[in-house]
A protein has these predicted regions:
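N-terminal, positively charged, Ser/Thr/Ala/Gly-biased leader segments
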Residues: 22, 37-96
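An N-terminal boundary/leader segment
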Residues: 1-56
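Conserved small/polar residues in nucleotide/adenosyl-binding loops
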Residues: 175-183
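Hydrophobic face of alpha-helices
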Residues: 26-30, 55-58, 78, 111, ...
Length: 183
C-alpha cells in the first residue's frame, strides 16, 4: 500500500490493521507527517503541528504492541485538536493575536482521553479568531484553503480540521460545536 492510500484510510480500518500487525503506528504517522509537510504550506490546516511529539508517541505505541500490552481504542491512530481547545504544553492561540504565544498548563479532558486511548497527537488545527466565523482566516495564521479547490474555503470554524481530514492529513480531528440555546 502506498503512503497516499494509507493516508486516506479510515480510523477504524487503520485500527484493525494495527491490531492485526499488518501496519505499524510508526508507518502511519510517518506517512501522515510527510503529507502534512508537503500540503500544509498550501492548505494551512495546522497552525501548530507537533511532529516530534507524534513520532515519539508512535514509537511508544509500536513498542507497546510488540510488548503485548493492552491497546486502547485509538492505539496508533493519528488525531488533531482544534486550536480553540487547551492542550498542555502546546501553543493554544484560539486563532487570535491576543493568545499567539499562549502555552497552557491545563488541557481539555478529551485531549487526555484521546491520549489515554493511544491516539497519536499530530498538532493543532487552524480556526478563525475565537471560532466566531464561517471562514477559517485567522489573523495569526492566515486563510485555510479547501483541498479540493484552493479558491474555496473549507468553512469555519473548524476549517482546519475539515481540510485536514479531507486532504488525508490524519483520519481524526477533535473539534467542537457550540449552538445557541433559548434563554
Amino acid at each position: 500500500m502506498n503512503n497516499e492510500d494509507l493516508c486516506f484510510r479510515s480510523a477504524s480500518d487503520l485500527a484493525s490493521d494495527i491490531r492485526a500487525r499488518r501496519i505499524s503506528p510508526v508507518e502511519i504517522t510517518e506517512a501522515v507527517l510527510d503529507r502534512i509537510s508537503t500540503l500544509n504550506p498550501k492548505l494551512n490546516c495546522f497552525c501548530t503541528p507537533t511532529p516530534d511529539t507524534a513520532m515519539d508517541q508512535a514509537r511508544r505505541a509500536e513498542q507497546e504492541i510488540m510488548d503485548g500490552r493492552p491497546l486502547g481504542l485509538l492505539h496508533g491512530i493519528p488525531y488533531s485538536i482544534k486550536d480553540l481547545q487547551m492542550t498542555r504544553g502546546v501553543r493554544t492561540m484560539r486563532g487570535s493575536k491576543i493568545f499567539e504565544h499562549s502555552v497552557p498548563e491545563d488541557e481539555n479532558p478529551l485531549q487526555t482521553r484521546l491520549a489515554n486511548a493511544g491516539g497519536i497527537f499530530l498538532g493543532k488545527t487552524t480556526t478563525p479568531e475565537f471560532g466566531w466565523k464561517g471562514v477559517t482566516d485567522s489573523p495569526v495564521t492566515g486563510l485555510t484553503r479547501n483541498p479540493w479547490n484552493l479558491d474555496c474555503t473549507p468553512g469555519g470554524s473548524s476549517g482546519g480540521a475539515s481540510a485536514q481530514v479531507a486532504a488525508g492529513l490524519g483520519p481524526v480531528s477533535y473539534t467542537h460545536l457550540t449552538l445557541p440555546t433559548k434563554a
